[in-house]
C-alpha cells in the first residue's frame, strides 16, 4: 500500500513500520506521546478497484489486548466501500504477532475503498490483493483536501470504540 495508486492518510511509514508522528519528535513531547506514536489510530489506506475480492495481508508488530476494549480495536481493520461500512477483518483470537491474511468477497464493480488501521496495534506492513485482471486505481479525491489537526483525549479519539473505523 506504500505505492500508487494507494493513498495513505493519517500515518506514514518510518523505520520499518507505520507511525502517527516521527518517533524522535514524539520523544521530545513526553513519554505518553512517544508510547502511542506507533499506534495506528486514524491511519487509512484508500484506493479504487473492480475486483471481486480484497485480500488483506497485515503484518502487525504490536497487539494490545485490553480487558475494556474489543480485540479488533488493536488487531483488526475496517473496510469502507463508497464511504459506507463494508466489513471488519481481524486475526484469530490465538494470534499474537506477525502476519495474517483475510480474503473478503466483493461484487466485481468499481468502488472506492478505505481500509482503516487498528487503533492500538502497530502495523509493520499492509498489503492489499485484488483479483487477476482487476483494475486498481487512485481513490476518489477528498472533497476538501485541506488537512485537519485535532487534539483531544482518548475519549475524543474513540479510545474504546467497538471497531477501528469508529475512532
What are these regions (language model features)?
Residues 1-147:
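N-terminal secretory targeting modules
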Residues 145-165:
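Catalytic nucleophile-elbow at a beta strand-turn-alpha helix junction centered on a G-D-S/GDSL motif
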Amino acid at each position: 500500500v506504500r505505492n500508487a495508486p494507494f493513498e495513505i492518510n493519517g500515518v506514514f511509514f518510518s523505520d520499518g513500520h507505520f507511525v502517527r508522528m516521527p518517533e524522535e519528535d514524539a520523544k521530545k513531547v513526553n513519554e505518553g506521546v512517544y508510547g502511542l506514536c506507533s499506534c495506528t489510530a486514524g491511519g487509512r489506506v484508500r484506493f479504487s478497484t473492480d475486483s471481486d475480492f480484497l485480500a488483506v495481508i497485515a503484518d502487525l508488530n504490536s497487539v494490545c489486548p485490553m480487558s475494556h476494549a474489543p480485540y479488533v480495536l488493536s488487531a483488526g481493520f475496517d473496510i469502507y466501500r463508497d464511504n459506507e461500512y463494508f466489513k471488519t477483518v481481524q486475526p484469530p483470537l490465538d494470534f499474537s504477532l506477525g502476519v495474517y491474511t483475510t480474503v473478503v468477497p466483493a461484487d466485481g464493480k468499481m468502488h472506492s475503498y478505505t481500509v482503516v488501521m487498528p487503533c492500538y496495534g502497530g502495523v509493520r506492513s499492509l498489503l492489499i490483493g485484488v483479483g487477476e485482471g482487476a483494475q486498481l486505481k487512485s481513490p476518489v479525491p477528498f472533497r476538501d483536501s485541506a488537512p485537519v489537526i485535532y487534539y483531544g483525549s482518548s475519549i475524543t479519539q474513540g479510545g474504546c470504540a467497538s471497531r477501528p473505523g469508529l475512532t
